[in-house]
Amino acid sequence: MSSDAKKEAKHKAAMEKQKESVDASIAAADEERGVGILLTGNGKGKTSSAFGMVMRALGYGHKVGVIQFIKGQQLSGEEIYLRDRCPDVAFYQMGTGFTWDTQDRSADMAAARATWEQALPMLKDPSFDLVVLDELTYMLSFDYLSEDEVIHALQHRPKEQSVVVTGRGGGTRLREIMDTVSEVKDVKHAYNAGIKARRGVDY
């Protein structure tokens, strides 16, 4: 057998083994319900990933709600797109700027509570297929919201509803109740090299 033929046979065997593993995992997954997803870590891409799922859900005609607990001074591309092109998406932002800009704990707690009150009805409404709670973890880390209340709401949402939570940290309890936890690692970031945030890429 030639060298190329051996490589081809080895590749085919590896792919067949991989397919068997994937098929077995698919066959074993027989429960039908919404999922809880936590996108955390210190790397870039958590919110971007969440909005990718928003686009995916909209492609299937699903009802989507998006709550952003931290809003910077700069308009984001996703905010512009959703408001201009996707009026059916229930979209709400806290609107006080980043908490490290305001430096007013009382005001931030009040804003977090008001924003959470916008999220709660979505988490109780079975007509919502997907709810994104962007940067919610900070509200827990800063103790702006009751962890017990947030955990209870996430655990008791409608069975078919999926929820995506983004942000660094969030605590052990949040990780434990989520079905999928992905940690985005900061390996290298343009900002650290002095490169400005790019419109359409970073915001």
Question: Which residues does each PLM region occupy?
Answer:
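Extreme N-terminal, non-catalytic leader segments
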Residues: 1-36
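Generic detector of well-ordered alpha-helical packing
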Residues: 69, 135-136
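Conserved P-loop
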Residues: 35-124
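Residue-level preference for short coil/turn positions at secondary-structure junctions
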Residues: 32-33, 60, 127, 159
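A generic structural signal for short, solvent-exposed coil/turn residues
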Residues: 31, 83, 155-157
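Short gly/ser/thr-rich secondary-structure transition/capping motifs
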Residues: 19-22, 113-117, 163-166
